[in-house]
Amino acid sequence: MNVNAAPEIVGRASQGVTPGYMSGFGNSFETEALPGALPVGRNSPQRAAYGLYAEQLSGSPFTAPRGANERSWLYRIRPSVKHSGRFAKADMGLWRSAPCLEHDMPIAQLRWDAPPMPTEEVTFVQGVRTMTTAGDVNTQAGMAAHMYLISRSMVDQHFYNADGELMFVPQQGRLRLVTEFGVIAIEPAEIAVIPRGVKFRVELVDGPARGYLCENYGGAFTLPERGPIGANCLANSRDFLTPVASYEDKDTPTELFVKWGGALWRTSLPHSPIDVVAWHGNYAPYKYDLRTFSPVGAIGFDHPDPSIFTVLTSPSETAGTANIDFVIFPERWMVAENTFRPPWYHMNIMSEFMGLIYGVYDAKPQGFAPGGASLHNMMLPHGPDREAFDHASNGELKPVKLTGTMAFMLETRYPQRVTEYAATADTLQDDYADCWRGLEKRFDPSRP
């Protein structure tokens, strides 16, 4: 398998919405797996159809403004109180939460190679490796950047995260996310977001899988404002897909893992918790194909700020200052005249964690491989390496299309603390800073 190559779009319908999904972002959806399972004109009937229980899942306070109010009504075989037992602490493995100060690593620009696939059997819960944490999970602010390495599907195991919503960014291998709300299938170049409190399990489709995982402790991801761009381009609402209802009526023992307060807890259940027969509301998991992102850019001169590539944003209480921005660098045309076209040299109040899904990143043609990661923390300088600088400074400025590439960035207002796993990993590149060593003094006061 060539992990550097851009994957083809698999399973997309030629017209209309992909079967098994509903189109739109933040819509008030309704879906039922059995006819008549959804009540009409009310949320909590005296007796729900099919002997179901009505239950509300709230992703925001009751009194949140209507535009930010998130909740769904679920009609399920058993209420969630039956999916809860005596919890005991479970081994967190390499999963960490903010604040995490377990390693006193000197400040530096950092980069990692792709981690190798595990040789032992590892499920999703066991396979999360935290790279950085930021903010504080207990104040619902900040994030964690993880890698996941999975070699075995979750069988009779389920999980939900009370600490934050999870964004899956596959890099190698397809995943099947079996959630309470329905089934989501994703592949490299797609993402999936699972809200807080939503139970799910992770299944492999075609062998071991590797990817990135963003844990958002703060406000839910939403679409960024377009401002003067107008009503179109960037990520369009219609390209987000939410699953239709499906359920399991399965009375076999299962384990339920819950991440709560930065710790992992487990309990045993006599049945599957994936038992929602119908639901309606706007608090639900979704997927998005990054290849449908419509980029905008400079069509005259200069290099615009990377914020024009924002797919989703988790806002903070300060307008224009994100808890997290999820930004991608997809295929696009470079046409600016008399311009240094790669990302410029930069020091930033925001902290940037980057990953590469496939292809080559234009500012780092060497050393930044698919499945790898980099960290440029707040106010630490970064920018193109010597090779990228020389090529961009001296090359012919004809229109060039960057093809077969997909990088992303998780940018947060908080400094990102490196975990012990990330600080001591064999994949950490000790010589990363050497990529700028070849940049020479070019100043000559006699030559304007």
From Swiss-Prot:
GO cellular component terms, A-Z: cytoplasm
Residues the entry annotates as binding Fe cation: 346, 352, 382
Family annotation (CDD domains): cupin_HGO_N
Keywords per UniProt: Dioxygenase, Iron, Metal-binding, Oxidoreductase, Phenylalanine catabolism, Tyrosine catabolism
Active-site residues, record numbering mapped to chain: 303 (proton acceptor)
Swiss-Prot/TrEMBL cofactor(s): Fe cation
A GO biological-process term: L-phenylalanine catabolic process
EC class name: oxidoreductase
Cited Pfam families: HgmA_C, HgmA_N
Reaction(s) catalysed (UniProt annotation): homogentisate + O2 = 4-maleylacetoacetate + H(+)
UniProt pathway: Amino-acid degradation; L-phenylalanine degradation; acetoacetate and fumarate from L-phenylalanine: step 4/6
Positions bound to homogentisate: 361, 382
GO molecular function, one term: homogentisate 1,2-dioxygenase activity
HAMAP family: Homogentis_dioxygen
Similarity comment text for this entry: Belongs to the homogentisate dioxygenase family.
Official protein name in the record: Homogentisate 1,2-dioxygenase
The organism of origin for this protein: Rhodopseudomonas palustris (strain BisB5)
The gene coding this protein: hmgA
